[in-house]
Amino acid sequence: MPEITVRAKSKTYPVYINEFALDDVRGKWTESLAKYSHVFVLTDGHVAELHKSKLDEILTDLPVVTYYVAPNGEEAKTFRVYEDVMTKMIESGLDRKAVLIAFGGGVIGDLGGFVASTYMRGIPFYQVPTTVLAHDSAVGGKVAINHPLGKNMIGNFYQPEAVIYDTQFFATLPEREMRSGFAEMIKHALISDYTLLRALMDTFTEPKDFYTKDLTPFLQRGIEIKANIVAQDETEQGVRAYLNFGHTFGHALEAYGNFSKWLHGEAITYGMIYALTMSETIYGLDFNLAEFKTWLRNLGYDTTFDVTVPFSNILENMRHDKKTTFNEISMVLLKEIGKPVIFKAEDELIFETYKRVMRNGEDAF
């Protein structure tokens, strides 16, 4: 089974990835879990309905297991749900020798990691992601909840004990969720390797390919790219910011849509094309953007806006981005594919780029 080692400054841990990862690690994982006083599983309603029985089968011999089922989607990453999870943990008698399992997509991983990092000043946790999107968020230790004014504004850096990534769960993902997660795979290729991007474009040409082609080697490569960056810069003081390519504009768009209008990967896709457009302006990026947009459309990504998104809202949300310092908005741009750079963008440039990609319902991207 493919195994990747993440060597962050604070912790070294494995990422297990294949179609039957849970079965493959079951013996040694349950042996490790048995050492804890209490196992607390955080999941959401959708995952619980489809896959709880699989986890039950593995945890059946453990003496104390408690589940908390959070709301589906970004609604789970709120103060209200965070407090409710904490209340459940306290009422269930979890002590500092307890362990948390985040069983779900990126939202559950973010929430679960933040809960684990703050409960009694920190308890261990495991990431058991169930979505394509979570191949990015489950690795690297960035955990957070949202604030109404910005995404992931309240958070921490807190590494898991391990990531157990069982790709059999993908079979139940809706196409829209698959596409959302695939956007992060595209991001990893854009910031690291044109050859990887070309392989993605040649392998995945229509939506059904998400289910019929093998995602695992591409997911593994994306995780390796991220693990290498995290090893250099765990707390995002430098190169780790490159992983935010497309996220400055994308997060601003998510906030404008109240974290419900667009899925994360959908917003990030718009954000990546916004950043590619700005990269053409600033660095003369040599990249066939027209071919790239056509490929996205063939995969089912929406490349038009049917609503007017006010620039004032986007700009204000971009100012709340975590990379913004001294009121200067930092963008991750590309000098060329695989060569990202941090660029401090002035409002005029942000607006000019905005006008190029947001044409009030025309083919914005």
UniProtKB/Swiss-Prot annotation:
NCBIfam families: aroB. Zn(2+) binds at residues 184, 247, 264. InterPro entries: Dehydroquinate_synthase, DHQ_synth_AroB, DHQ_synth_fam, DHQS/DOIS_N, DHQS_C. Belongs to the sugar phosphate cyclases superfamily. Dehydroquinate synthase family. One of its GO terms (biological process) is aromatic amino acid family biosynthetic process. SUPFAM superfamilies: Dehydroquinate synthase-like. GO terms for molecular function: 3-dehydroquinate synthase activity; metal ion binding; nucleotide binding. It catalyses: 7-phospho-2-dehydro-3-deoxy-D-arabino-heptonate = 3-dehydroquinate + phosphate. It is found in: Cytoplasm. Pathway: Metabolic intermediate biosynthesis; chorismate biosynthesis; chorismate from D-erythrose 4-phosphate and phosphoenolpyruvate: step 2/7. Its main location: cytoplasm. Keywords: Amino-acid biosynthesis, Aromatic amino acid biosynthesis, Cobalt, Cytoplasm, Lyase, Metal-binding, NAD, Nucleotide-binding, Zinc. It comes from Listeria welshimeri serovar 6b (strain ATCC 35897 / DSM 20650 / CCUG 15529 / CIP 8149 / NCTC 11857 / SLCC 5334 / V8). Catalyzes the conversion of 3-deoxy-D-arabino-heptulosonate 7-phosphate (DAHP) to dehydroquinate (DHQ). NAD(+) binds at residues 106-110, 130-131, 142, 151, 169-172. It comes from the Bacteria. This is 3-dehydroquinate synthase. The lineage of its organism: Bacteria, Bacillati, Bacillota, Bacilli, Bacillales.
